[in-house]
Regions:
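Glycine-rich beta-alpha junction loops
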Residues: 37-41, 62, 83, 107, ...
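Rossmann-like NAD(P)(H) cofactor-binding subdomain of soluble oxidoreductases
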Residues: 1-68
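N-terminal first-folded block
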Residues: 129, 220-223
Length: 224
């Protein structure tokens, strides 16, 4: 194989297996081996390092779904590993239009959990909102169309002013009666009710809100 850089873009559980399968097939001295896992470190490629390669993990903070090819322009890539491999990875990221930054090995699991909150779990939250919409007599298709403007504005607010200044609704106002009303009606959608209580508690912990003690009592009176 004449390539100087090999980038293993395989499921996490298969990275070490793929590296092992290639270990004896290539003369690794002077080559660069990368993998694209967000949760695992460059040590998954240790067997190639032992054979003379320099290795790194290179992960884009971006969502990829079947049939979609998102632009990588401006996308941040977290990189860690051997110094020489990181230099190569940074050049590759730049060529892709992204921006690379360093991450410590010990921080990768938390980094990947962060990304999971930012996209897959956000999608799970949106699926939950569709169930609440159904309780209000709104179909899934209609709910998606009607939610899109508020979702886009919420993300725009977050991007422009951050979470605290972009927060709105009954919790920031300390509207105990409305929160109580929500919790009562959500008894008919128990999974959504659990999510509501968990997120409301997070809001009281991390975001500005009036009547925090009263809101906490309401949430405590409606255990999930």
């Amino acid at each position: 194989m004449h390539a100087n850089v090999l980038w293993f873009c395989v499921p996490d559980a298969e990275i070490a297996l793929a590296a092992r399968s290639f270990a004896g097939k290539i003369r690794w001295k002077g080559k660069v081996a990368l993998h694209s896992s967000g949760a695992l470190t460059s040590d998954e490629l240790a067997i190639l390092r032992e054979r003379g390669a320099v290795v790194a993990s290179v992960h884009p903070m971006m969502t990829f779904v079947r049939g979609s090819r998102p632009s990588l322009a401006g996308v941040p890539f977290a990189v860690e590993g051997d110094t020489a491999a990181i230099r190569v990875a940074r050049r590759m990221v730049k060529d892709l239009g992204g921006s690379a930054y360093s991450i410590r090995k010990k921080d990768k699991a938390a980094y990947h959990a962060w990304g999971t909150f930012a996209s897959p779990l956000l999608t799970a939250l949106l699926a939950t909102t569709e169930q609440v919409a159904a309780a209000a007599g709104v179909s899934r298709k209609a709910a998606r169309a009607r939610m899109t403007p508020i979702l886009l504005q919420t993300l725009a607010n977050y991007a422009e002013v951050g979470a605290a200044s972009g927060f709105s609704g009954p919790i920031i106002r300390g509207d105990v009666d409305t929160v109580n009303r929500h919790l009562r009606v959500l008894r008919g959608v128990p999974a959504a009710r659990e999510v509501y209580v968990a997120l409301a508690r997070a809001a009281l912990q991390y975001l500005p809100a009036k009547n925090k003690n009263a809101l906490k009592r309401v949430l405590d009176s409606h255990p999930s």
